[in-house]
Structures are given as C-alpha cells and as structure tokens.
Amino acid sequence: MREFINKVFAELDIGLRPLDPETLESANTMSGLNIVLRADLGAMTLEGRCDLLALDDICDPRFPEFQKHILRLNDLDFLPGDFRIGVSLVDLTVQMKGVLSVNPGDSGTGGRIMHMLKSMVFYGTVSRDRLLSSYDELYQESSGTVPEN
C-alpha cells in the first residue's frame, strides 16, 4: 500500500513528500500549514493531521474557556463530518485530523487525497484565524490588553 500511495502522491504532482518507509509519514507544508499524512497499513487508511496553533500554557486560567472555542469548531455547520479539531496535550498544539480509506488500485484515490488536502488547507486556515481571534478576545476580556504576536 505504501508504494501505491507514493505513486498517487507523485501523480498528483503537487510536491508531496513520499511516505517514509519506517514511520509511514509524509510531512508537508501547504499554504503555511504543516500537514502530516500517515498511512495505517492495517486499517487501509491515510490520516491527515494539521497543526493549527501552538499552545503556550494549558495551565493558564483562560485555557478552559479557549478549549470551548476550539471544540465548537467541530460543529457540522462549519467543519465537514470527516474532520475533527482537538488539543494534543503531547505536542501542546491544536490539531485538525481527517481520515481517508485507501484501496490500492482504486483510480479515485488521487482525487480523494487531493480533496482531503484542499479541505485541510481551507478549513485549517479558517479555523486557525478563528482560534487566533477567539484567543485575542479572551485575552482582552481578562487583562484589558492584547499580547503582541
């Protein structure tokens, strides 16, 4: 399956790095977003993960309120059902994830991967902007000032 996915990546001709033979990951930067694609050979899936925002301090008293803003982005009236946004406590980042079934030999795989990537870039960019705006609003409400970015 790794060879199939790497072939599809090459056919898309958008500069995707091939899957690493050991980690089965492909780290890419698209429109300023770090997007990692990871194959799961057992489940026959390709997971897309996009870091939206680094978190400085989850012990900050504002974090629980900010986390509510993060989770609200999962509403179906905004984010498609095959994507989810959450907090990675290991990486201290807000991440968006999506999963795509891969069937070697399926001629539509390239189109589905391209759709997933375009969706990640669009929704990732919009989500990041919304999160930054929410963070700035929370910071203003609690301290009366906005931090310098």
Regions inferred by a protein language model and the residue ranges of each:
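Charge-rich, low-complexity N-terminal segments
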Residues: M1-L41
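Hydrophobic residues embedded in beta-strands of well-ordered beta-sheets
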Residues: L24, M44-L46, L92-V94
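A short acidic-to-branched-hydrophobic micro-motif
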Residues: I35-D57
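Ampiphathic alpha-helical segments that act as solvent-exposed interaction surfaces
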Residues: R62-F78, V99-D136
